[in-house]
């Protein structure tokens, strides 16, 4: 999925004093990709409801997969479905199983059932977006649907993609009704087409060709009506607009401290081959199991042959000052900084539960589960845009791609690879897209409110990481101030626990139409929750969390981050709030219930809050016992 650090076309613009994005390739072609966002219709049964439901107690089977399967059968009695092969047991002991609904042997691409099974084998919670309407006749008998090549041409025409498809031909991949489209140009790899159903915004089922095109600025799944090729029913973008002499971890940007030489900074549990190896190869360039970093001044899709510094002694120490210009004079330092920041964050997220089984980004998973061969491609000085950054998140087993652009709002221009908050924000898109819906399903955050939560998670994680030793809940933080050369930053308000400094509340979302403004509301709520937990447990100012016997971080900052990671799911604020509360039940037995509720309620997401896409109802009420 693709989300940006800044708003692109079709999104609400930021305040006039803040920088705006040049947009992505589709923006420049005047196609509003947001008009094609999928709608999100789902239910979520939280842990409190699940434990009180007598019928769920009888579903327990020998293992978590059988238990989850029985739940789907009991809830969706007439549905056909398949298990998505990305199930795993998280670091908190909760098993996660994902199911995909099928019809006539074809996937219903946006019909998912996500189940969490507790340590004792009981149903902990679940989310369900299965289609409940009538199933049409089997289209594979008459085969009166369009050709996949024609579907590619339709997507290319309607979205104004830069793909040449006149000589394209379809070759079967061997999977059911799935084709590689050969003979094209303009895409990073051969486009693919798969025949699937899609639940449309009106609730009806449509037979579509899901056409996958990676054109660098956008990595798209386009759902083209298979009957007519005249209508696009939805678009998912895997990319996300907006990562060892370095600014050390914890320094957000050059204004917060000086560069230093760090030695062997990796966590050997998360990066057992160090950052420079894959278990079979050791590199003398910024490349390893988790990432490969390079400059990309032409903005192209190639990266293996691009420039990156080489050191036979693995001493990546290069000069950089704020006065250096042009960027080519400090490219070695930029590549090194990006590689460092992305790797530290990889290791931290691994400790918080985003490991191999959960779908993280690694070449060699070393037998720990999940799909490998998917390190993050890190492009600094990317020439395809300015004043932004982005991250493309395909499903587990395919590399993520981060592109860091130069910002021209100061003289000399500033390099986004030197602002850790931007790198962390972008990498968090990879985290949230892999965790929400399962590692094999990266298109669950495409609706407006869920897309906003994706942006908010990125801002929250970046802000939590930059907290300093002397900070209290009175400390405010902006986002992107250095890179934008603007003390106000790139968001409407700073992150603050003061309702005067940042007045955002849940009902503000009713009047917001962009993922970034919506994300600011969500991150503000998470900031409140974090400070409630810090006030209770204190703050660990080290680079890594310390865990108690129950597997929970012992301090408030890392506990908040752990709960956010464990609770990443679901399409709207109310359900995501419940998921964080459920994550706390799984991790601590619900010890922090009231601290979490108070943080959300302060910002209008209390127990009486209700979701509606057009008329959200706010509430400052707390549940009984708080």
From Swiss-Prot:
Function description: Secreted metalloproteinase that allows assimilation of proteinaceous substrates.
What biological processes does GO assign it?
Answer: proteolysis
Provide the organism lineage as a comma list: Eukaryota, Fungi, Dikarya, Ascomycota, Pezizomycotina
- Specify the inducers: Expression is controlled by the prtT transcription factor.
Q: What is this protein called?
A: Extracellular metalloproteinase 1
A Pfam family that the UniProt record links to this protein: FTP
Active site at 426
Q: Which residues, renumbered to this chain, are glycosylated?
A: 315
Q: What is its EC number?
A: 3.4.24.-
What is the species of this protein? Phaeosphaeria nodorum (strain SN15 / ATCC MYA-4574 / FGSC 10173) (Glume blotch fungus)
Cofactors demanded by this protein: Zn(2+)
GO-annotated cellular components = extracellular region
